[in-house]
């Protein structure tokens, strides 16, 4: 749903990629496409592994079970030079695996960080599962 939303209406993100991150329109469009690819990739991957344990034969005859579970709380700090694609990749990977996420975008692209988080909340990700912290690098250091 988020990928489709961004794909059908990328204009606000493109505008701020150009004006806040300094990208050309072509670079902004490329970053939007990459962000959409991340969303679709992680949604497809989680469907493959969700609730599926794999039985693995061990080298000495034992049987091992590989299972996936959430790890807890993730911190995603995004760079200024790919503020949408990398951030969406980080968030979608962590959320797809059932983790809570705190996001701290670069202070140079904080509007884009806010807009990305807003997209996830709009499509049903609870605020308690995806939080946003804005500030300079000292906030990232403290986190």
What residues fall within each predicted segment?
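N-terminal Rossmann-like NAD(P)+-binding subdomain of aldehyde/semialdehyde dehydrogenases
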Residues: 1-62
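Rossmann-like NAD(P) dinucleotide-binding subdomain of oxidoreductase/dehydrogenase enzymes
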Residues: 18, 22, 46-143
């Amino acid at each position: 749903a988020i990928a489709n939303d961004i794909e059908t209406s990328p204009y606000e993100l493109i505008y701020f990629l150009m004006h806040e991150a300094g990208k050309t329109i072509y670079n902004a469009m490329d970053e939007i496409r990459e962000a959409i690819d991340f969303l679709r990739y992680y949604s497809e991957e989680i469907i493959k592994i969700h609730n599926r344990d794999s039985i693995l034969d061990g080298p000495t005859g034992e049987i091992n079970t590989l299972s996936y579970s959430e790890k807890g709380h993730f911190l995603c700090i995004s760079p200024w030079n790919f503020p949408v694609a990398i951030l969406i990749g980080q968030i979608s990977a962590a959320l797809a695996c059932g983790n809570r996420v705190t996001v701290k975008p670069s202070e140079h692209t904080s509007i884009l960080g806010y807009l990305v988080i807003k997209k996830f909340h709009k499509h049903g990700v609870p605020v308690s599962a995806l939080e946003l912290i804005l500030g300079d690098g000292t906030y990232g250091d403290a986190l």
